[in-house]
Each structure stands twice: as structure tokens, then as C-alpha cells.
């Protein structure tokens, strides 16, 4: 049996966010009534994968028990990976992380590679904060690839990977089973989970937020009530699937921002059954239940929050993943696009498809922008003039779009690559320079 990544998956998914799942690819492969029997069914090995401390409170504790053909320890020693490496995991001052300018920054899309490039080889770090070694903060990567991973497997020990495809589907094989992900969906691969990515459409491009800190969770809804935003039932986790395949394979590990490789003589996708609440999942952003004003004003963008990584300060998240999906705008006598803003938090934005309603041009699918702490930002001149004159007695639908934001409590520091790349738009600031002075003290 193999996890055939050459065609779409046929198995279904398990529904729910953070559930205690139990799934087996062979009948009776899950031990009954215990986690680690003296002899596991089918001659399997029992292995626990811990995503939090053993003593974390029950509501935050994440772990899974895997029943596999060989333990994860079975591989040759790691050695430095000699292929292309453009990753950063420490965001203090260094050759990779120069002083952070207060300028608003915007980039064109990462070009598609000319040479054959898989998902791992196509990764590049654009920005981040904190430290993978200290397990706080995040790294923001882009990827551009044009070939599937071949006899190669990958995992990150640095953090969980929130993957946002922008172009091209991803067929992702993991130790837990299969995820098929397309643009307008996201996938989350937990820290330490081994996976491989196939590209059924050839070229693929997208964004990744690698979360070094507390695991992503659904936000509390407060006065919204018991339903709304991203509903738990719409998060999908793989059913158990396995392959018993031997050969000359390569296992790549990411640790403290560096890539390492080891020879491995079998596929690590040999988990026949598993149970627990620490597992990969995907979510369709088009299912987000958008909340907005039906009277006046544009509410704070926290109403668009999909997932959060909490910090030690109540009400202040380390990372927020926010989307700006299709939605109706109905507020009267209101400037409907996102307003002009300076923020104590820092904002890295991307665009999956369509146009963002605060920028008439320049911010294109696959591109990105960074507005750091207290850097002024907001609609460009054309957007402001149009929105200031529109008839707000009639509702308007923002359609055929999907923008998103990684917002963090601490400064997002662009890497040397991000500041030196030809994709950096040197004229981004010009979009605000044509904003006119309308002030007249004689006319209210």
C-alpha cells in the first residue's frame, strides 16, 4: 500500500478542531484500552508524539499516539544539508537580519524557479521575530516550486507550519494520512510531523507562517456567541493511511533555521493507526462566517480572526491569522474600506486571489506587504477618493477576493533577502503621495 500522490485523495477526513481523534487503516490496529501494550497489534511499534509539555493543562495539552511499522528513530545520523538554504530562525541583529526600517514595505510575487525545485528547496524566509530556539515568535516564509518532492521527506523541529497556498494545489502526505490543499484553503503541519509535498499542477507558490510559540487555536467568540468566524466542524484532519515502502530515501530536518539531511531506508509514512489531538489539519477559508457592521463604521479587523497563538499577556496574541474574504458592506455614512491606521502590532499581508479593497493597484496575488509597529498605512489615494464619494445607502459586495494577514505583537523584522530582493517595490510609498489636502476651516 502506498500514499499515491499522483492523483487526488479518495479517503475522507475527520471533522473538528482539536478533537481527540482515533483512526486506523487496518481493523484492530489501535490497541484497546491502553496506549503502549506489551505487544502492539500487527507487530507495530507504539510511539508518542508530544506537542506540549506533559504537564500542560488538560485543555492545552496536545499529543498523539502513533502505531507504526518502525519507530521514528530509525534513520542514519544527520549531516548538514548542502542544497539551497535561505531560511532564518533567529531574529536578532545578524548578517541575515539587518536593522529594521520603519518604512512601509511591499513586494511583487516570488518568481517561479527556472531549475527543478521542490517545496523544501523553494523556501525563503522574508521576515519574522523572536527565536526558534527559545520557542517564541515566528518566521514568515514564501515558497515557489515546480516539482514534487521525490524520495524525500521533511519536518520542522522549529514550529508548526501554517501554509497558505496562492497558486497550485498541494498534495501533502504526512505520518497521519493525506491532506489535499488548494488555494483559498490552508494547512497546518504540527512541529515535528514528517511530510512530503507533491505538486499536481506543476508550478506552486504560497506563504507560510512558522509559529515558534504556543500552538494555534480558535479564538474565543465573546459577545458574538456560540457560533461564527471559523467554525470548529470545518477543520479537517486526515484519516490514517500508510505505506510500507523501502528504498534509498532522504529525511530533511529543520532545526534552529538550518537544514539537515539523513539517509533513511524506509518511508516514514508507515503509521497504520493513531489517536490523539496533535495532528495536521486543513481549513477552507471560503467557509469563514464573516462578521461586520450593519449600522455604521468599519469594526476592528479582529472580527476576521481565524486562528491565534496566545501570548502570556491576556488579550494580546503572539500571532493572529486574519483573512479578508468576500463580504457585504452595508454601513451607512461610513468610509467602508479599512481606515488609515497606526498599530502597536505589526502586520504582514498577502493576497491569494482578486484585489484587496484598500489598494487599487500594486498589491497583487502572490505579493506581500509589511507595515510594522506604528508605521502609518491605509487606503491609497484612488481608493480613498472613490470610497469617499460612493452611495452608502446601497450595500456593496466585496467579491472574488481572499487577502490575509499575519499580525504579531512584536516587531516583524525583514531578512536581508527581503530587503535586497528585486521584488521589493521601491515606489510603494508613492501610493499615498497623491492624497490631497481637503481641509477648509471655513467649510464644515
Curated annotation (Swiss-Prot):
GO molecular function ontology, one term from the record: iron ion binding
GO CC entries: cytoplasm
Cofactor(s) needed by this chain: Fe cation
Stretches assigned to coiled coil: none
EC number: 1.13.11.5
Catalytic center residues: 298
Known pathway: Amino-acid degradation; L-phenylalanine degradation; acetoacetate and fumarate from L-phenylalanine: step 4/6
Alphabetized UniProt keyword annotations: Dioxygenase, Iron, Metal-binding, Oxidoreductase, Phenylalanine catabolism, Tyrosine catabolism
Binding site residues for homogentisate: 356, 377
InterPro entries named among the record's database cross-references: HgmA_C, HgmA_N, Homogentis_dOase, Homogentis_dOase_bac, RmlC-like_jellyroll, RmlC_Cupin_sf
Reaction(s) the record says it catalyses: homogentisate + O2 = 4-maleylacetoacetate + H(+)
Function: Involved in the catabolism of homogentisate (2,5-dihydroxyphenylacetate or 2,5-OH-PhAc), a central intermediate in the degradation of phenylalanine and tyrosine. Catalyzes the oxidative ring cleavage of the aromatic ring of homogentisate to yield maleylacetoacetate.
Protein family per UniProt: Belongs to the homogentisate dioxygenase family.
Subunit structure: Hexamer; dimer of trimers.
UniProt cross-references to NCBIfam families, sorted A to Z: hmgA (TIGR01015)
HAMAP family hit by this protein: Homogentis_dioxygen (MF_00334)
Protein name per Swiss-Prot or TrEMBL: Homogentisate 1,2-dioxygenase
Species whose genome carries this gene: Burkholderia vietnamiensis (strain G4 / LMG 22486) (Burkholderia cepacia (strain R1808))
Amino acid at each position: 500500500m502506498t500514499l499515491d500522490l499522483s492523483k487526488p485523495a479518495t479517503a475522507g477526513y475527520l471533522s473538528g478542531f482539536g478533537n481527540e481523534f482515533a483512526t486506523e487503516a487496518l481493523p484492530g490496529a489501535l490497541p484497546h484500552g491502553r496506549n503502549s501494550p506489551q505487544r502492539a497489534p500487527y507487530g507495530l511499534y507504539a510511539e508518542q508524539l508530544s506537542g506540549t509539555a506533559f504537564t500542560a493543562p488538560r485543555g492545552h495539552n496536545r499529543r498523539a499516539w502513533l502505531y507504526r511499522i518502525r519507530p521514528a528513530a530509525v534513520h542514519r545520523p544527520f549531516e548538514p544539508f548542502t542544497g539551497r538554504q535561505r531560511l532564518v530562525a533567529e531574529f536578532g541583529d545578524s548578517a541575515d537580519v539587518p536593522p529594521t526600517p520603519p518604512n512601509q514595505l511591499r513586494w511583487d510575487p516570488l518568481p517561479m524557479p527556472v531549475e527543478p525545485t521542490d517545496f523544501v528547496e523553494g523556501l525563503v524566509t522574508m521576515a519574522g521575530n523572536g527565536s526558534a530556539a527559545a520557542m517564541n515568535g515566528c518566521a514568515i516564509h514564501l515558497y515557489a516550486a515546480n516539482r514534487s518532492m521525490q524520495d524525500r521527506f521533511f519536518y520542522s523541529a522549529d514550529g508548526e507550519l501554517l501554509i497558505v497556498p496562492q497558486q497550485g494545489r498541494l498534495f501533502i502526505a504526512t505520518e497521519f494520512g493525506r491532506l489535499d490543499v488548494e488555494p483559498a484553503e490552508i494547512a497546518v503541519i504540527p512541529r515535528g510531523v514528517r511530510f512530503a509535498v507533491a505538486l499536481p499542477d506543476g508550478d506552486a507558490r504560497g506563504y507560510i507562517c512558522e509559529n515558534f510559540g504556543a500552538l494555534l487555536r480558535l479564538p474565543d467568540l465573546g459577545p458574538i456567541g456560540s457560533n461564527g468566524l471559523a467554525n470548529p466542524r470545518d477543520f479537517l484532519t486526515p484519516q490514517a493511511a500508510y505505506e510500507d515502502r523501502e528504498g534509498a530515501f532522504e529525511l530533511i530536518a529543520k532545526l534552529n533555521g538550518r537544514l539537515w539531511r539523513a539517509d533513511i531506508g524506509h518511508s516514514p509514512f508507515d503509521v497504520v493507526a493513531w489517536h490523539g489531538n496533535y495532528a495536521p489539519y486543513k481549513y477552507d477559508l471560503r467557509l469563514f462566517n464573516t462578521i461586520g457592521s450593519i449600522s455604521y463604521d468599519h469594526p476592528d479587523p479582529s472580527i476576521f480572526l481565524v486562528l491565534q497563538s496566545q501570548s502570556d499577556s491576556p488579550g494580546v496574541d503572539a500571532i493572529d491569522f486574519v483573512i479578508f474574504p468576500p463580504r457585504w458592506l452595508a454601513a451607512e455614512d461610513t468610509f467602508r474600506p479599512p481606515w488609515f491606521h497606526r498599530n502597536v502590532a505589526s502586520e504582514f499581508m498577502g493576497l491569494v486571489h482578486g484585489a484587496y479593497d484598500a489598494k487599487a493597484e500594486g498589491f497583487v496575488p502572490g505579493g506581500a506587504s509589511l507595515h510594522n509597529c506604528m508605521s502609518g498605512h491605509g487606503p491609497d489615494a484612488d481608493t480613498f477618493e472613490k470610497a469617499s464619494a460612493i452611495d452608502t445607502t446601497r450595500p456593496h459586495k466585496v467579491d472574488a477576493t481572499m487577502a490575509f494577514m499575519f499580525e504579531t505583537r512584536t516587531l516583524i523584522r525583514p531578512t536581508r533577502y527581503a530587503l535586497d530582493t528585486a521584488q521589493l517595490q521601491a515606489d510603494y510609498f508613492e501610493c499615498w503621495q497623491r492624497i490631497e489636502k481637503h481641509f477648509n476651516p471655513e467649510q464644515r
